[in-house]
UniProtKB/Swiss-Prot annotation:
Pfam family, one: RadC
Record protein name field: UPF0758 protein PputGB1_5335
Protein family (similarity comment): Belongs to the UPF0758 family.
Superkingdom of origin: Bacteria
Classification lineage: Bacteria, Pseudomonadati, Pseudomonadota, Gammaproteobacteria, Pseudomonadales
């Protein structure tokens, strides 16, 4: 059945307008973004199929461009719109955290950093720069690497901390392989950065690792001392 023939309260777009986006399923939200289906498949069936094949909404939005463009109903324009939406979401979250009077706890920091890094398909390393009251000054991805490694240069981290006049910072990087467990290289790098930043009176409060599950705090797990 064509989706236009459905009762209004069951159509994703009308449902969103009447009841709010929060009540929609992932497939319904994606259907609203896609706008239309393809021959023989309405837009909701198309959205459901995409989520099944890619393994979920996050996996679909973060998939390689070539893989997405192979799907029926997804052209370059639609792909660009989806990527723009993803970036808008990240920037909205980034703006919210910058406006915060202070970080309200480690859990909020982990949620924020996960949202900023989880889409990356290669390993990246970033810093959340903080003032003396641990209020956010800026977040930057400083280094990008391959699927399993990003080269980090302590001198550049120090330079960016000075540029932002930071009193403290939180290091972060992702593990695209999925595991959040720190490697020995991760631990050694963190200790090296702590020593270097201490020379300019900048504290390293934590190093957060983003994998497939919950973000890992190296401080909370005893790998380093804040």
């Amino acid at each position: 059945m064509n989706i236009r023939e459905w009762p209004a309260e069951e159509r994703p777009r009308e449902k969103l307008l009447q009841r709010g986006a929060v009540v929609l399923t992932d497939a319904e939200l994606l259907a609203v973004l896609l706008g239309s289906g393809v021959a023989g498949r309405n837009v909701l069936d198309l959205a459901r199929g995409l989520l099944v094949r890619f393994g979920g909404l996050r996996q679909f939005l973060e998939a390689e461009r070539e893989a997405v463009l192979r799907e029926p109903g997804i052209g370059m324009v639609k792909y660009a719109q989806l990527q723009a939406l993803l970036e808008i979401g990240r920037r909205y979250l980034d703006e919210n955290i910058k406006r915060a009077a202070a970080l309200d706890g480690p859990a909020a920091v982990r949620r924020y950093l996960k949202a900023m890094l989880r889409h990356e398909v290669s390993e990246v390393f970033g810093c959340l720069f903080l003032d003396s009251k641990h209020r956010p000054l800026a977040f930057e991805i400083l280094f990008r690497g391959t699927i399993d490694r990003a080269s980090v240069y302590p001198r550049e981290v120090v330079r960016r901390a000075l540029l932002h006049n930071a009193a403290a910072l939180i290091l972060c990087h992702n593990h695209p392989s999925g595991s959040s467990e720190p490697s020995q290289d991760d631990v050694h790098l963190t200790l090296s950065l702590k020593r270097g930043l201490a020379l300019i009176d900048v504290r390293v409060l934590d190093h957060i690792i983003i994998g497939d599950g919950e973000p890992l705090s190296m401080v909370e797990h005893g790998w380093i001392v804040a």
